[in-house]
């Protein structure tokens, strides 16, 4: 049993929920959950991230990703506040750690766990973002609202400040 078996179990549940709804992500997740090789897990984690970022790039930035480095697109999504900051951090972590799988660099097996955990966080956010039906529940996305978390917190804060100034 690998030290990342719990993370693979979580990703397998996600795989089951996206089956038939997002073929590119499904393909990469299927390969990821079937392997127990640490290098291959890192490679397929990055490939899952690439599928997600390429899709977001086409939807939000209205262009194809092309050959632009993944990190540059992550930075752009962060700068333009398209993706919530906590998801950006997870994307950066998966992107940087997954290079160990693609290149002959040394890494500790326990470093694979946080990559898979971050990928789980990213994909769960992405499922909500893409309005994919999960377990029979269709999640809606409001285009004007920053996706899934971003501006909700800010708008509530503004309401509290406005309400407190009105009561003075």
Predicted regions and their residues:
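Amphipathic alpha-helical interface elements
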Residues: 1-164, 168
């Amino acid at each position: 049993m690998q030290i990342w078996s719990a993370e693979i179990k979580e990703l397998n549940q996600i795989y089951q929920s996206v089956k038939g709804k997002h073929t590119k992500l499904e393909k990469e997740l299927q390969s990821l959950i079937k392997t127990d090789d640490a290098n291959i897990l890192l490679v397929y984690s990055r490939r899952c991230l690439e599928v997600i970022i390429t899709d977001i790039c086409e939807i939000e930035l209205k262009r194809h990703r092309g050959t632009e480095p993944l990190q540059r697109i992550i930075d752009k999504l962060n700068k333009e506040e398209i993706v919530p900051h906590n998801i950006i951090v997870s994307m950066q972590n998966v992107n940087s750690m997954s290079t160990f799988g693609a290149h002959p660099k040394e890494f500790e097996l326990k470093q694979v766990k946080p990559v898979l955990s971050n990928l789980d966080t990213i994909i769960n956010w992405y499922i909500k973002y893409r309005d994919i039906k999960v377990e029979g529940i269709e999640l809606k996305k409001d285009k004007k609202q920053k996706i899934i978390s971003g501006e909700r917190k800010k708008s509530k804060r503004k309401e509290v400040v406005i309400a407190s100034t009105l009561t003075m």
